[in-house]
From Swiss-Prot:
This is Transcription elongation factor SPT6. It comes from Eremothecium gossypii (strain ATCC 10895 / CBS 109.51 / FGSC 9923 / NRRL Y-1056). One of its GO terms (cellular component) is pericentric heterochromatin. InterPro entries: RNaseH-like_sf, RuvA_2-like, SH2, SH2_dom_sf, Spt6-like_S1, Spt6_acidic_N_dom, Spt6_death-like, Spt6_HHH. The lineage of its organism: Eukaryota, Fungi, Dikarya, Ascomycota, Saccharomycotina. Residues 1232-1329 form the SH2 domain. It is found in: Nucleus; Chromosome. Pfam families: HHH_7, HTH_44, SH2_2, SPT6_acidic, Spt6_S1, Tex_central_region, YqgF.
Length: 1432
């Protein structure tokens, strides 16, 4: 093997391609006894190598979550080399591209004469229903076809350098830097060494020779700019030194200046980086680390760079793998689509393939694809999308996953090839192009490690050139295989490979051959006898040898990829999921528990989890809390195992040898299946977790999008203007004590003024005082809308009061419109009022003022309010009831994709973002950008020191590279302003204020020209002059433009475009028409003020899960109103108790006599009034004791373990009763022998007493029972139950007492007639010569010994039965050869019971025993002694 191949093999061991599996696939030594082939004799270094190798291998084939985390760490560790300038230039447009761009935008440039080939040849749009134009017109118009060129062409034409570059270089000069140099003192960096200082000085001198790119600014203006933006460029000088091109130029300059400087001196010079100057934490905070700078400079969307950071050789798939990816992703997404069986999936696969190409090859973000490549993800024959935005995001993430799989597949393939072995199993896998699942790849890798550990070690040891530590494989299987005991595996009659082929074919294509004359045990014994010297450890332990052979044969089967793949396929088809409760879970999961609906879940299929994905995530959560275990298995798994055995391993021979070999094979096969099932169950568990998280995240995403998808509140739709907003809150609602706060924001969102109202709006003495103050505030503020919210239901009262005042005084705004009063969502305001951002913006304002400011901003733009939340604040939002089940990064991703979709739907005005940091927060979500690129974008705009006039300047001013421009240009707009025309020699394009992408500007001008019905020659003339944008201006001023645009036949024109260019543009044309009518029309949903139960939840914090009809809540009595009671709940909901709902009516007493003000009582909710935030409740006992808890889940017995639930309910009842008995008050019986003891306490008390002592105590059976505990012998006590009848009350003694079905009048009667008789009989039997003390074992031994000494004599004895106090054993033997027999005798209050006959004395008992024995035959006696009604 070559050294290169060995290095790769070793690298496989050292890198993250190690297998994620257990160290051994075979059972542990603890299960099987000592593994004699375990290589524990290896030296310590090898052990260390093993451990390290194991740790390394655990990184192989990780989950997506682990990949995300590891990729971040790798980015932090990896040093990125900065790209040379010529690489960066690849992302910028050539001069030819600029020519095309500016021509599209309608800017005149000096261009070369066009040939016929380059003139446009598109046929003008025909009006719907109009006759076709003449052929001559078609030929003339056809010459314009090539005008729809791609203005992102990579071709360059040096002859025609545009005026843009010249214009960019007109200004600037040496004098600017000279003036700035005066502000830099030489001792500013006095801590530098001389070499560093000299290097910086020379760099500065070299820069002073370059032109300055600051357009039209004097030195005074530059100073002013630096004063304003200085904080934004603290790192500029360091970045410049770090810049690779500057360093290269600096080296050249130094070479010229210091030709005589030695190479040693140059080597000592230190390169200055940001890390040398600033603290790493500051760099991370400001996104200025090396990794951040690489992301900023790369012409790839930032979000894509972050996702792909951990992948190597991204985008370098072969054509076969590209097709494979298309099909793989299509299959993944199709699962959620639920296509009909008749649906032609080819169109769907084509759409997925186009989307994958846009994402992976062209680096286009989801928003761009959805907006400008819509025809490629839409159906040709039907209306609507084939792929939604959700699908596109899924494709983005699946693309990353697929590249990861392919990389690992290729790495394993390379590893296999470098081992220099040939294995048909592995070859078949790599020849199957459809095998792209990680689980199968893991099987192959594990198989190679299992089967070829020796070859791997040889390859590593042969590589003597490596200086790295070798992680040798320590395989006990290899040692077993090389031993003579392996012959027993060969004697099995079939190999693991043949078993795999049999299972795959589902028939015995390789029949099993039984050993002709040896059983398995005999085969192993023969091997041990023949190789006793080598297998000494097995010499006296053939069972260990048997287990070892079976163990490794099972390991061969369990590691065979074909076996595993077949079982995996079947398992995935038929698996079900059950919940197995733990003792803790059975006790703790009760009603209202978050796991109540899954407590007895069984037979759950993948379909159940797709429809309710939170269910499986809650199962996992409960399992992590040790409340339950998740059991994943096949339905009819035992039958499946037997079926596999029959088709793969069983022989039909019925000989004893064949039967034993079948049993041996069955045990090994089942052992292998058990391990395979365990592995596959874990795979399914991980996959279900991943799928469920994805589905819940999608639900979170949709809910959050509904929050973001709100336009600003527009009071009057006929005048769609941003309103002046007045927001009000009453704080804690203590009217008259706390002030009411109001805040005014103008239309631009600027804070104007805050107001304080100290008057009580509900003051009965001076109600007009509040009304006058409120009227004055509204008249001064002149708001168009009033927003309100607060922390408790008192806000609802203020809301109604404000509405009443406005209606009463007929207050209107300055346009005479009614002023709406609305409830505003305050989840952002709550966070803003105490946030660091709020403190920075309004450091001197009270908390409630900042709360009102945030409410007003929300009315202006919910989207901007959410974009300005910090990451921690976003994580704290309550969006979905199950969001806590998601990992933090998945939840964050769901929110981020929501932001991206909505922000790009709305767009961002470039110049406004440059001037307004609050508005600029949305920039990071524009397609192509991100946090880092947004910062870079703003810094570039600020360096211009002038407004951006046209989208093309994003390219011509080097603000964006080609790919980022392509992604973002359509979503970054520039408001039309005729005053901007005087700046530069650049025409501001109307289309820059629309959603039309610059690549479609030429199409837009064609649409406008055709709508205006211009002559083709006139259109061609304007096109040659670069003045096509004039048609846009003319169309905008045309009052009939809607009719003219809507009459165009866009479908025919789109077909013509597709035939001539291959581009599908129908949706783009529709967008052009809509945008020409109204640029950047509002597409969001209307603003959503809170309504009904939403207001109730906002003010109380209660939901339908915590506050519902039938629930029991604590309420505090506030006051009495007539015979009603006014209460309040913990959430400040007013609760009214009507006269019929409390005890006052029943007891005919006033409520104030029964209930106390300020005291808390349990109450049942009868009715909820959401509008007035109140409820009707009941305080009656029979209502409170019966709480209604709705069951919103199915207890269908096919998916719910009803049997287990009923058993657990019964067990809980018993436990509850026992606990209740233990806790209840002890009864007091007036009797000298009564003690307040339980059973154990009674025994402890009597333990030191004499035989026959007793006590009377309370019974655990209830208040109608007592118990007598009396002592029969040492540590032997009997508990006698006494049933009480005719009781006056629960605690009184019954007038009739029942003991053993006998009636007694009182306790003394029981003691005398029952207990003392039993004590007397006990003394009689224990004093008899036929009674023997001791345990049953001791008495049996005595009888056996006696019988052996006297073999011809019969013998019998009585003894205590310690397991059943009150009973005696009667044990006997007829002679020494007979079996010892045992009969049972019961002690009663009037004798001894044997065989259902009572004997008054012991003598009579002995005589009766002898009579029974004589009357029975010997055989009958022996049978009775075994299982008779009075014997054992």
């Amino acid at each position: 093997m070559s050294s290169e191949g060995l290095a790769s093999a070793r690298e496989l061991e050292e890198r993250d391609l190690g297998a994620t599996r257990d160290t051994e696939e075979i059972p542990s030594d603890e299960e099987e006894g000592e593994d004699v082939f375990d290589s524990s004799e290896e030296d310590e270094d090898l052990d260390e190598d093993e451990e390290e190798a194991r740790k390394v291998k655990e990184g192989f084939i990780v989950s997506d979550d682990e990949e995300d985390d590891s990729s971040v760490k790798q980015r932090r560790r990896r040093k990125h080399k900065r790209r040379p300038r010529h690489e960066e230039d690849d992302g910028k447009l050539s001069e030819d591209d600029l020519d095309l761009l500016m021509e599209n935008a309608g800017v005149k440039r000096t261009t070369r004469p066009e040939t016929d080939a380059t003139k446009g040849r598109f046929k003008r749009l025909k009006r719907a229903g109009s006759p076709d134009e003449s052929e001559g017109q078609q030929d003339t118009d056809g010459r314009h076809e090539n005008r729809l060129e791609d203005f992102f062409s990579e071709e360059e034409d040096e002859e025609h350098l545009g005026g843009t570059e010249n214009r960019r270089l007109r200004t600037g000069g040496k004098d600017v830097l000279d003036e700035l140099d005066d502000f830099i003192e030489e001792d500013e960096f006095s801590d530098e060494d001389e070499a560093t200082r000299q290097q910086r000085r020379k760099l500065k001198e070299q820069r002073s020779k370059q032109s300055v790119q600051i357009t039209g600014l004097s030195s005074d203006k530059i100073d002013e700019m630096y004063d304003i933006f200085g904080d934004g460029h603290d790192y500029d000088w360091a970045l410049a030194v770090e810049n690779e091109d500057d360093l290269e130029n600096l080296d050249e300059y130094q070479q010229e200046e210091d030709d005589d400087e030695t190479s040693d001196q140059k080597a000592k010079k230190k390169k200055i980086t940001l890390q040398d100057i600033y603290d790493m934490q500051d760099l991370k905070k400001n996104l200025m680390t090396e990794e951040d700078m690489v992301i900023r400079r790369s012409d790839i969307p930032e979000r894509y760079q972050e996702l792909r950071a951990g992948l190597k050789n991204y985008g370098q798939l072969t054509p076969e793998d590209q097709l494979l990816e298309q099909n793989w992703i299509s299959d993944k997404i199709a699962v959620d689509k639920n296509f009909d069986a008749t649906y032609d999936i080819s169109e769907f696969r084509e759409a997925v393939g186009d989307a994958v190409r846009f994402i992976s090859k062209e680096n286009l973000e989801v928003s761009f694809i959805y907006a400008y490549r819509r025809n490629y993800i839409s159906s040709r024959d039907k209306n609507g999308f084939i792929l939604s935005e959700d699908d596109l995001w899924d494709i983005v993430f699946y693309d990353i996953e697929f590249h990861s799989i392919i990389y690992k597949r290729d790495y394993v393939k390379k590893f296999y090839e470098q081992l220099g072995i040939r294995d048909s199993l592995v070859d078949d896998y790599f020849n199957d192009e459809s095998m792209t699942e990680l689980n199968s790849l893991q099987d192959i890798y594990n198989y190679l490690e299992f089967r070829y550990a020796h070859e791997i070690n040889d390859a590593l040891l042969a590589d003597s050139s490596s200086k790295t530590k070798k992680h040798l494989k320590n395989s006990s299987y290899e040692k077993f295989k090389s031993s003579s005991l392996y012959q027993a595996v060969k004697d099995v009659g079939i190999t693991a490979e043949q078993i795999g082929e049999n299972i795959g074919a589902e028939t015995q294509i390789h029949p099993v051959v039984d050993h002709p004359n040896l059983k398995p045990s005999e085969s192993i014994s023969q091997i041990l006898d023949a190789a006793s010297a080598d297998l000494q450890v097995f010499a006296k332990n053939h069972k260990l040898a048997w287990d070892t052979v079976q163990k490794y044969f099972a390991a061969e089967i369990g590691n065979n990829p074909k076996v595993r793949q077949k079982i995996r396929n079947d398992f995935y088809k038929y698996y079900i999921v059950d919940v197995v409760l733990t003792t803790k879970g059975r006790k703790e999961i009760q009603r209202s528990s978050p796991y109540e609906d899954i407590k007895y879940a069984i037979n759950r299929t993948p379909g159940h989890f797709r429809s309710a994905p939170d269910v499986f995530l809650r199962m996992l959560e409960a399992e992590s809390l040790h409340l339950m275990n998740i059991k994943i298995h096949m339905s009819s798994q035992e039958q499946y195992c037997e079926h596999l055995f029959q088709i793969a391993l069983e022989t039909t021979n019925t000989s004893e040898i064949a039967i034993e070999w079948n049993n041996f094979r069955r045990n090994a096969f089942y052992q292998a299946l058990e391990k395979i099932f365990e592995d596959i169950a874990q795979e399914i568990k991980d996959e279900l977790k991943k799928t469920s998280q994805k589905l819940v995240a999608n639900s979170v995403r949709h809910r959050f999008m509904s929050k973001l998808d709100q336009a600003p509140f527009i009071p009057n739709p006929r005048e769609p203007k941003i309103p002046r907003v007045l927001t009000i809150t009453c704080g804690q609602g203590r009217f008259g004590l706390d002030a009411i706060i109001a805040v005014l924001l103008n239309r631009k969102g600027d804070f104007v003024k805050d107001f304080k109202i100290v008057q009580n709006p509900f003051d009965r003495d001076q109600p007009q005082a509040f009304e006058a103050v409120l009227d004055n505030i509204i008249q001064e503020a002149q708001p168009n809308v009033i927003g309100i919210n607060g922390p408790n239901p008192k806000t609802q009262k203020l809301f109604k009061k404000i509405q009443e005042v406005i209606q009463k005084k007929q207050i209107v705004d300055n346009r005479g419109h009614n002023i709406p009063v609305i409830f505003v969502e305050d989840e952002i305001a709550i966070r803003y009022q105490s946030s660091e951002r709020g403190a920075q913006e309004f450091p001197n304002k009270p908390t409630l003022v900042k709360y009102c400011i945030a409410l007003a901003r929300y009315i202006h733009s919910p989207l901007l309010e959410y974009t300005n939340l910090s990451e921690e604040e976003l994580q704290s939002l309550l969006i979905h009831p199950h969001q806590s089940l998601l990992p933090r990064h998945i939840f964050k991703r769901a929110l981020e994709t929501s932001f991206v979709d909505i922000v790009n739907l709305v767009g961002v005005e470039v110049n406004k973002a440059n001037d307004n940091p609050y508005y600029a927060k949305a920039l990071q979500y524009i397609a192509g950008l991100g946090k880092r690129k947004a910062i870079d974008f703003l810094e570039s705009l600020q360096r211009l020191n002038e407004p951006l006039l046209a989208r093309q300047q994003l390219i011509t001013h080097d603000i964006l590279h080609k790919t980022i421009f392509m992604n973002s240009a359509g979503f970054l707009y520039i408001s039309w302003n005729e005053k901007n025309q005087r700046y530069e020699d650049l025409e501001h394009d109307h289309l820059d204020s629309t959603r039309i992408h610059p690549e479609d500007y030429h199409l837009a001008t064609k649409v406008a020209a055709d709508a205006l019905e211009y002559d083709p020659d006139a259109i061609r003339e304007k096109e040659e002059q670069g003045a096509m944008s004039e048609f846009i201006e003319l169309l905008r001023d045309d009052p009939d433009r809607r009719m003219k645009l809507e009459s165009l036949n866009l479908e025919e024109y789109a077909d013509e475009l597709e035939r001539s260019t291959g581009q599908r543009k129908l949706n783009n044309l529709n967008t052009i028409v809509l945008e020409l009518l109204e640029g950047f029309e509002e597409l969001r949903n209307d603003f959503h003020p809170l309504q009904g139960d939403e207001i109730f939840t906002s003010l109380t914090g209660e939901t339908d899960k915590t506050f519902f009809k039938g629930s029991i809540i604590p309420v505090r009595v506030e006051r009495f109103k007539h015979n009603d009671i006014i209460c309040i709940s913990n959430s400040q909901v007013e609760c009214i108790v009507n006269a019929q709902r409390h005890l006052g009516v029943q007891l005919k007493r006033p409520a104030s006599d029964i209930y106390e003000v300020g005291k808390t009582y349990p109450a049942k909710i009868i009715f909820i009034d959401y509008e007035n935030i109140s409820a009707e409740v009941s305080l009656l006992d029979h209502d409170v004791k019966h709480q209604y808890i709705p069951v919103d889940y199915s207890k269908d017995p096919t998916i719910w373990n009803l049997k287990q639930e009923l058993e657990d309910v019964e067990e809980e009842k018993k436990i509850s009763m026992a606990e209740a008995r233990a806790k209840r008050t002890h009864r007091v019986i007036n009797h000298p022998y009564y003690f307040p003891f339980n059973g154990k306490q009674a025994e402890d008390y009597l333990r030191s007493k004499e035989r026959g002592e007793f006590i009377i105590r309370q019974s655990s059976r209830g208040d109608d029972h007592l118990a007598i505990t009396w002592k029969l012998d040492k540590d032997l006590f009997q508990h006698v139950d006494i049933l009480e009848l005719d009781k006056e009350n629960p605690l009184a003694l019954g007038k009739t007492l029942i003991v053993d079905n006998n009636k007694y009048n009182d306790l003394d009667h029981v003691i005398v007639e029952y207990l003392q008789n039993k004590i007397k009989l006990l003394n009689e039997i224990t004093s008899n010569e036929k009674f023997k003390k001791g345990t049953k074992k001791e008495v049996v031994k005595f009888i056996e010994d006696y019988s052996n000494v006297n073999p011809n004599r019969s013998v019998y004895y009585l003894s205590f039965n310690y397991e059943h106090p009150g009973w005696f054993y009667l044990m006997f033997k007829i002679n020494a050869q007979s079996k010892l027999c045992t009969w049972n005798v019961k002690l009663t209050h009037n004798g001894f019971s044997l065989a259902d006959y009572n004997y008054p004395t012991v003598i009579q008992l002995c005589n009766g025993f002898k009579t029974l024995l004589k009357s029975s035959s010997r055989a009958r006696t022996q049978e009775a002694s075994g299982s008779g009604y009075y014997g054992y």
